[in-house]
UniProtKB/Swiss-Prot annotation:
It comes from the Bacteria. Zn(2+) binds at C16, C18, C37, C40. Part of the 50S ribosomal subunit. This is Large ribosomal subunit protein bL31. GO terms for cellular component: ribonucleoprotein complex; ribosome. The keyword RNA-binding applies. It comes from Buchnera aphidicola subsp. Baizongia pistaciae (strain Bp). The gene is rpmE. Binds 1 zinc ion per subunit. Binds the 23S rRNA. Pfam families: Ribosomal_L31. Keywords: Metal-binding, Ribonucleoprotein, Ribosomal protein, RNA-binding, rRNA-binding, Zinc. Belongs to the bacterial ribosomal protein bL31 family. Type A subfamily.
Length: 69
């Protein structure tokens, strides 16, 4: 087996926006910030979020006070 061909592994900290910290080993040498993790993602928590942000057309109608059909 050849030596020094495998990347180095570093222990890094992954920080979620919910405050959860996860320590993992990675070939990256810096810490990572993520938006969602298994602690706060709806698939893992079983809680369903409703998204009340409309599409582009709804935003346009709302901005210019146009009634939709």
């Amino acid at each position: 087996m050849k030596k020094k061909i495998h990347p180095d592994y570093f222990k890094i900290n992954v920080t979620c926006s919910c405050g959860n910290n996860i320590n993992i080993f990675s070939t990256l040498s810096k810490n990572i910030n993520v938006d969602v993790c298994s602690k706060c993602h709806p698939f893992y928590t079983g809680q369903q979020r409703t998204s009340d942000t409309g599409g582009r057309i709804e935003k346009f109608h709302k901005r210019f006070n146009i009634s939709s059909h």
